[in-house]
Amino acid sequence: MQRVTLTLDDDLLAALDALSARRGYHNRSEAVRDILRDALNQDPPSPESRRGYAVLSYVYEHEKRELASRLVATQHHHHDLSVATLHVHISHEDCLEIAVLKGDMAEVQHFADDVIAQRGVRHGHLQCLADD
């Protein structure tokens, strides 16, 4: 490991310390390492890491005109990527779906884009983990 020095303004340092306390980190370095890992996982995978896993989560209005049917059709069109899907009724109007995906990361990104772009889908998020 290498030692580095960071300069942070007071508000950002206070936020880091509060996060560290909430999550039970023993020191700031552990918190910064996890924050960096998370940020790096948010970037699209590099071309050399073409396969991997991903979690796609999104909320949608199940009564929106034919949205549920369109989402199911999209999932079936990309059936080879799907490992598992969890469906949760979070209110009378809204459903939360969480899909675990595996495969070519460009295809995974395309699938996520198709789902998130549907009218009535909110809070779409794709978390990627490329194979090492």
Swiss-Prot record:
Q: Which cofactor does it need?
A: Ni(2+)
CC cofactor note: Binds 1 nickel ion per subunit.
**Which positions are annotated as binding Ni(2+)?**
H76, H87, H89, C95
Which InterPro entries does this chain map to? Acetolactate_synth/TF_NikR_C (IPR027271), ACT-like_dom_sf (IPR045865), Arc_rbn_hlx_hlx (IPR013321), CopG (IPR002145), CopG/NikR_regulator (IPR050192), Ni_resp_reg_NikR (IPR022988), Nickel_NikR_proteobac (IPR014160), Ribbon_hlx_hlx (IPR010985)
State any single GO MF term: nickel cation binding
Q: Name one Pfam family in it.
A: RHH_1
Q: Where in the sequence is the signal peptide annotated? A: none
- Which keywords accompany this UniProt record? DNA-binding, Metal-binding, Nickel, Repressor, Transcription, Transcription regulation
Q: Which GO terms describe its biological process?
A: response to nickel cation
Q: Does the keyword Metal-binding apply?
A: yes
The subunit structure is:
Homotetramer.
- Family listed: Belongs to the transcriptional regulatory CopG/NikR family.
Q: What does this protein do?
A: Transcriptional repressor of the nikABCDE operon. Is active in the presence of excessive concentrations of intracellular nickel.
Q: What is this protein called?
A: Nickel-responsive regulator
Lineage from the top down?
A: Bacteria, Pseudomonadati, Pseudomonadota, Gammaproteobacteria, Enterobacterales
Give the gene that encodes this protein. nikR
